[in-house]
């Protein structure tokens, strides 16, 4: 099976698998990350086939929706790609991308690096910030039943991986614990450039949020 057909089959698989997913981690999120990754990849020396597969499968079984289990996603991707007779070397690379792409707290050190992961990670982080990022953040907060904001609960700026995974803090805290940190964690020049506008939009949003929260007119 040629690469184009594998991508086509992967799109079908992801759409079916995530048909009932939470709105911030559904097919439309995957689609945006896929497109962003392809755009960023134009300016990087990468294997585009690996980039596309990694982008499409990066949230195939997100640990947040599987009791914190980080092994289900890579395993599910391997089973699917093996069924399409994809080379094992590529499958292993995609597995490592899935295992290492997610932000897991400001104190967590990533264990694997590759140019392809850099591209996909930037794409995923871009979709976590800006207008879309704000919408996704509040959607997930509502899904988890979290408060919008509580001035008495301060953000934890140095969370460990386990603290991050277990956190049920108000949604506004997530801006400080993750979203506002991402601009400086972009891997590629293109990712950093694209992150600038989205980062500024979040800062403007927060400024307006606090004015309205305080009852200002």
What feature does the model see in each segment?
Residues 33, 69-83:
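An active-site-proximal "capping" alpha-helix that borders the catalytic cofactor pocket
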Residues 80, 84-121:
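Hydrophobic, well-structured mid-protein blocks that either form specific transmembrane helices
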Residues 2-6, 25, 48-49, 69, ...:
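A generic short alpha-helical patch detector that favors 3-5-residue windows
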Residues 27-34, 52, 91-102, 203:
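Short, well-structured alpha-helical segments
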